[in-house]
Design a protein with these regions (language model features):
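Alpha-helical transmembrane segments and their membrane-interface junctions
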Residues: 61-77, 145-164, 242
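Aromatic-capped, Gly/Pro-kinked transmembrane alpha-helices
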Residues: 159-191, 205-259
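Divalent metal-coordination and catalytic microenvironments
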Residues: 15, 42, 71, 112, ...
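Alpha-helical transmembrane segments of multi-pass inner-membrane proteins
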Residues: 6, 10, 14, 92-96, ...
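Hard-cation-handling environments
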Residues: 130-200
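Predominantly late transmembrane helices and immediately cytosolic-facing juxtamembrane segments
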Residues: 19, 23, 91-129, 194-220
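Hydrophobic, small-residue-rich alpha-helical packing segments that form membrane-like cores
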Residues: 1-84
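Interfacial and helix-entry/exit segments of alpha-helical transmembrane bundles
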Residues: 33-69, 91-100, 125-150, 225-226
Length: 259
């Protein structure tokens, strides 16, 4: 609802680099663990997979909007334009964006800490058997990491800079109203990066130093925990309201209409 379509496309563009980096990096980890995909069955292998570890750190930093990496330029731009709408909807969108950026950073570092730090938890694969991936798997990660680091800075002006609307987007995007050329206050610009930085020690404490705490918090409110862990039961709702009726409708047409 912000109307900043060029900013959204910019984030989609930068997002491609660091999200692909994390997906392929996850594949490298899965390869090292002989197809194990549960991060609860990993841990303590950052020295065994130094290149994969470093590259996934880059992807995580970019995803969370760490200052001066690609996600920092695009994600913060969306939040800034929401704030600059100057109305209740804009402030609400900016607040939700900041809060979700904070949560995103926590769960992203959860991935890193549970996968590479703490105790080794795999009973099927010995830690001596884990190994770094070959170059054929690492080179694509290196290429993507370059984009995850520099794509935001290099392409910022092209996507959302002054004049970019004229020579890059041209007539492909029609704005209902011009985007604000102002800048948010300094405190607002610093808020998201500060929360991103704060989330790192929080995630380390929760998922390395005091791993029982998340379980204790979940046990304090089991109904809410079950609701969230089951994704608001959206899959079940979708199955009941869309999938099953569609199957029955298809069966009806097959049996009684198609002959």
């Amino acid at each position: 609802g912000v109307g900043a379509y060029n900013v959204a496309m910019f984030h989609l563009f930068t997002h491609a680099f660091f999200k692909a980096l994390l997906f392929l990096g996850s594949g490298s980890v899965i390869h090292a663990f002989k197809d194990e995909q549960d991060i609860n069955n990993m841990g303590g292998v950052w020295k065994k997979l130094p290149y994969t570890y470093a590259l996934m750190i880059i992807g995580t930093l970019a995803l969370t909007g760490f200052p001066f990496l690609s996600g920092f330029y695009s994600k913060d731009a969306i939040i800034e334009f929401a704030y600059l709408k100057g109305n209740t909807t804009g402030y609400y969108a900016a607040g939700i964006g900041i809060f979700t950026a904070f949560l995103t950073s926590i769960y992203s570092w959860r991935l890193i800490f549970k996968t590479f730090h703490g105790e080794y938890n795999n009973k099927e694969v010995k830690i001596e058997e884990t190994h770094e991936s070959p170059l054929v798997m690492l080179i694509p990660l290196v290429i993507l990491s370059i984009g995850a680091i520099f794509a935001g800075f290099v392409f910022k002006d092209l996507f959302i800079g002054h004049g970019g609307d004229n020579y890059f987007w041209a007539e492909s995007i029609k704005f209902l109203e011009p985007l604000s050329k102002e800048h948010p206050p300094t405190w607002f610009l610093l808020l998201t990066p500060c929360l991103v930085l704060i989330s790192i020690p929080i995630a380390y404490y929760l998922f390395v130093k005091n791993k029982k705490l998340p379980e204790e918090i979940a046990n304090m409110n089991r109904p809410l925990y079950k609701f969230l862990i089951n994704k608001w039961y959206f899959d079940e709702f979708y199955d009941v309201t869309i999938i099953k009726p569609s199957k029955k409708l298809g069966l009806f047409f097959w049996k009684f209409c198609d002959g």
